[in-house]
UniProtKB/Swiss-Prot annotation:
GO terms for biological process: proton motive force-driven plasma membrane ATP synthesis. Produces ATP from ADP in the presence of a proton gradient across the membrane. The gamma chain is believed to be important in regulating ATPase activity and the flow of protons through the CF(0) complex. This is ATP synthase gamma chain. NCBIfam families: ATPsyn_F1gamma, PRK05621.2-1. InterPro entries: ATP_synth_F1_ATPase_gsu, ATP_synth_F1_gsu. GO terms for molecular function: ATP binding; proton-transporting ATP synthase activity, rotational mechanism. The gene is atpG.
């Protein structure tokens, strides 16, 4: 086999081996995506109930009367002068996820520019090695970092992230907090979201509830789904119930974002590996065509030489 043919054959074999790897990784990412989607849908039912109950309480006199007595309510609901801004950035630990990480980091930098934030008035809480390494290399103040989030994170697993973020806000390590993460839309699309989480505002809480109710009504247009605010009786007391519920709501936002981000990560990984597999198929087709043409040319040359030799003998 001529050297040129051997080189092309080697490229074909190498590309086929790479294709097998990317195809397998695509299937693994797709399986992880299916698994976490089921988990996320189950959690969203709980999170929506917490939000709905808190929204009802905010609109009721009970929350107003309890607010002056409740340290947690005051800490998480009441705005204060902003000296430091906390930014919770959720990225992946590894690569091979397409533009997933770069989009999140770009959106974070854009958000900082929009709100006039710099390393002197901003602290970072980072989930994922990519974000941690990026901001540390640029001299940013990373006050909390976490890596190794599992493929389907449970609340118990990421409990320290959630609790630390809320506690740091309560301890005035920062006076407001944003979350930046990739929101899963569908298997093709993900959008980076910048969400102002703390302090919790009544407007955002009620807007979220109205949006959720509108979506429910659209999905169930043939059924009356209007939400009726409930009358609550408190045991042991309204102050204790509201205190627990406000903290749960803040924590549910953060945990929900981690689940959403992980879902988007698996989707991005599956898409990146599918794209790599498709590209490998294109390369293999091109190389095989090149190989066949070169082989045909070599055969034609050999036949011509043999024919020429026989003619010369005659």
């Amino acid at each position: 086999m001529p050297a040129s043919l051997a080189a092309v054959k080697h490229k074909i074999d190498s590309t086929k081996s790479t294709r097998q790897i990317t195809s397998a990784m695509q299937m693994v990412s797709t399986a992880k995506l299916n698994q976490i989607q089921h988990h996320t849908q189950t959690y969203e039912v709980y999170a929506e109930k917490v939000k709905q109950m808190l929204s009802d309480l905010v609109k009721s006199h009970s929350a107003t009367s309890a607010a002056s007595q409740d340290d947690v309510y005051a800490a998480l609901f009441k705005k204060r002068a902003v000296k430091k801004t906390g930014v919770l950035v959720i990225t992946s630990d590894r690569g091979l996820v397409g533009s997933y990480n770069s989009n999140i980091i770009k959106q974070t930098l854009d958000m900082m520019a929009k709100h006039n934030l710099d390393k002197d008035n901003t602290v970072f809480l980072t989930v994922g090695k990519t974000g941690t390494e990026f901001f540390k290399k640029r001299g940013m103040n990373v006050v909390y970092e976490y890596s190794g989030v599992s493929d389907v994170p449970t609340y118990r697993e990421v409990h320290s992230i959630v609790k630390t973020a809320v506690q740091m806000y309560s301890d005035q390590v920062f006076d407001e907090m944003y979350m930046v993460y990739s929101h899963y839309v569908n298997r093709i699309t993900s959008n980076v979201i910048v969400h102002d989480v703390l302090p919790i505002t009544e407007k955002s809480l009620l807007d979220d509830e109205n949006e959720a109710q509108e979506n429910t009504e659209l999905n169930n247009s043939d059924v009356s789904t209007a939400h009726v605010s409930a009358e609550y009786e408190f045991e042991p007391s309204d102050t204790e119930i509201i205190s627990a519920l406000v903290a749960q709501y803040a924590e549910s936002l953060i945990y929900g974002a981690i689940l959403d981000a992980k879902t988007s990560e698996h989707s991005s990984s599956a898409n990146a590996m599918r794209s790599a597999t498709d590209n490998a198929d294109d390369i293999i087709s091109t190389l095989e065509l090149q190989y066949n043409r070169a082989r045909q040319a070599a055969i034609t040359t050999e036949i011509t030489e043999i024919t020429g030799g026989m003619t010369a003998q005659e």
